[in-house]
């Protein structure tokens, strides 16, 4: 879909760039596939802020998207429509099976209403189809890739994202991610063919602070602009640089400090995303 710019009749419209969503369905979602979504405002069950700079925003309805694709195997479904989903950057597709059952899936690029999609052990390499990643040919572009068999897609789910199959060995598939990381995924893990829809999401410009507030994002304050009681970078006469390496409000090093500690899955990462920066 194309980008949409506006005539600068107001200051906020001058910078505004949005994705043109005229081709999407304009009605409400299927009620049976939705549920209520309560906003936490960044607070936990004690009412304390656990994630700063969140709160407000437009009320949302949660669409139940099928990330597993393991029901109705080998049964072709018809794409009814492509819809907007306020809870994610990608678009979603409503599919209908011959028995009348419906579900939402992540919409890949080049998927249109009326197309047929199928999930099964051996499927054609066609956008929207899903199956074991080990049965797909090397070079295939995939999204919504499972990391654990049957748990549901975890990799490459946001707008425009994808991973590429670059090899196969001993029941595992080598994936190259957009970050540059190469990792092993079990061949029985499901993946969907194609790249995720809405690749122009990266080019939007919100144009004004209020549009960020509609998304539930509150103003982000710098530590050096605070008092010493509020942040390790706070205080000082006049403007200061913080006087130390960047840290979080709780004194933990940040801005480049490696935090990964999951050694259990290190063997599955063949090439780190940090290697290409060296």
UniProtKB/Swiss-Prot annotation:
Q: According to the UniProt entry, which residue ranges have a biased composition of type Basic residues?
A: 212-221
Specify the superkingdom: Bacteria
Gene3D superfamilies in the record: 2.30.30.30, Nucleic acid-binding proteins, Ribosomal protein L2, domain 3
What residue spans carry the region label Disordered?
212-278
Pfam short name (any one): Ribosomal_L2
Keywords from UniProt, A to Z, are: Ribonucleoprotein, Ribosomal protein, RNA-binding, rRNA-binding
**Keyword Kinase in annotation:** no
Its Gene Ontology molecular function terms? rRNA binding; structural constituent of ribosome; transferase activity
> What GO cellular-component annotations does this UniProt entry give?
large ribosomal subunit
Q: Which SUPFAM superfamilies match?
A: Nucleic acid-binding proteins, Translation proteins SH3-like domain
Biological-process GO terms, alphabetical: cytoplasmic translation
- Give a short account of what the protein does: One of the primary rRNA binding proteins. Required for association of the 30S and 50S subunits to form the 70S ribosome, for tRNA binding and peptide bond formation. It has been suggested to have peptidyltransferase activity; this is somewhat controversial. Makes several contacts with the 16S rRNA in the 70S ribosome.
Question: What does the sequence similarity comment in the record state about its family?
Answer: Belongs to the universal ribosomal protein uL2 family.
Subunit annotation? Part of the 50S ribosomal subunit. Forms a bridge to the 30S subunit in the 70S ribosome.
Question: What is the name attached to this protein's record?
Answer: Large ribosomal subunit protein uL2
The species this protein belongs to is Methylorubrum populi (strain ATCC BAA-705 / NCIMB 13946 / BJ001) (Methylobacterium populi)
